[in-house]
Design a protein with these regions (language model features):
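Extracellular ligand-binding/catalytic regions of CAZymes and related secreted enzymes
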Residues: 31-47, 74, 101, 227-230, ...
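A glycine-rich, often tryptophan-bearing local segment used as a flexible ligand/cofactor-contacting loop or short
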Residues: 51, 112-193
Length: 272
């Protein structure tokens, strides 16, 4: 009997060892599989397309955006394309607009332009698919042309209300700049939660947009210029598209850590 008990104990020990080995091997396989999935995700970098204009009144977007895009590429691994168009405002066009159709995120920092019908339709179709958009500063009159519109071109003034959820109601004085504050009730929002300090100063003049047309928009930042206070950054939904807009974007803003963090967080939020 003693020999049988010892033999049974020996067999149980071997069995438990085998089960442990199988479990550990399975866990290792799962870990390897997870790493492979992560590597695949890393290989599929999100495609971001910026639409910008070189315009004396467009706050040097043709200089600031390419530099910021390089940060997004080198430090954050995004696949970034910056499209700078050409032509008069009433007959403006971009090269390689097919990039917008393939983009995961479209960022607009353009001012008062009309585009060829086909190019405007690319933007509209992009949004109709529920893809996200970020608007910077002059985006709140990006496609509201004032110049004579050329034959075969079109503007899209409804973009401001329908997509950004606001109206362009004018501008505040240039001199005092803007005292920027995170809205306290939304301070935990991922777009602003890690911005420190939560108050800073922008050299740009304030855009007048209050009250927002979209009453459900989530205001993240307000700006004060003299006695004028306005929402200056918010999120909303345009159909199924996530939208972030900020009226910041003055050239000096792109040198400020707070603003760059704001844009980076907004990019992450829209792509999530």
């Amino acid at each position: 009997m003693g020999i049988l008990k010892r033999h049974k104990s020996y067999l149980l020990t071997i069995l438990f060892a085998f089960i442990s080995f199988v479990n550990s091997t399975s866990l290792m396989a799962n870990d390897i599989h997870q790493l492979q999935n992560n590597n695949i995700k890393e290989m599929k970098k999100a495609k971001i397309v910026f639409l910008i204009t070189e315009d004396p009144d467009n706050y040097e977007a043709h200089k600031t955006v390419p530099r910021f895009a390089e940060i997004l590429r080198k430090e954050h691994g995004y696949d970034v394309t910056v499209l700078l168009g050409s032509g008069d405002r009433g007959s403006y066009s971009y090269p390689n607009m097919k990039a917008v159709s393939k983009a995961d995120l479209l960022v607009v920092f353009a001012r008062r332009i009309a585009l060829p019908h086909k190019q405007m339709n690319i933007i509209k179709n992009y949004l109709a698919k529920g893809k996200p958009l970020i608007g910077i500063r002059t985006a709140n009159h990006a496609f509201t042309a004032r110049d004579k519109i050329g034959e075969g071109f079109e503007d899209w003034p409804e973009f401001v209300a329908d997509i950004l959820g606001c109206e362009n109601r004018g501008y505040g004085p240039v001199g005092p700049g803007i005292d920027v504050s995170v809205v306290s009730e939304n301070a935990n929002d991922p777009i602003v939660s890690n911005i420190s300090p939560s108050r800073w100063h922008s050299e740009g003049n304030i855009y007048l947009v209050a009250p927002l047309l979209d009453k459900k928009a989530k205001v993240l930042l307000t700006g004060k210029s003299n006695d004028i206070t306005q929402p200056i950054a918010w999120t909303r939904r345009a159909g199924k598209s996530k939208v972030f807009y900020t009226s910041l974007g003055y050239p000096a803003d792109f040198e400020m850590p707070e603003f760059k963090t704001l844009l980076l967080n907004a990019i992450k939020w829209t792509l999530k």
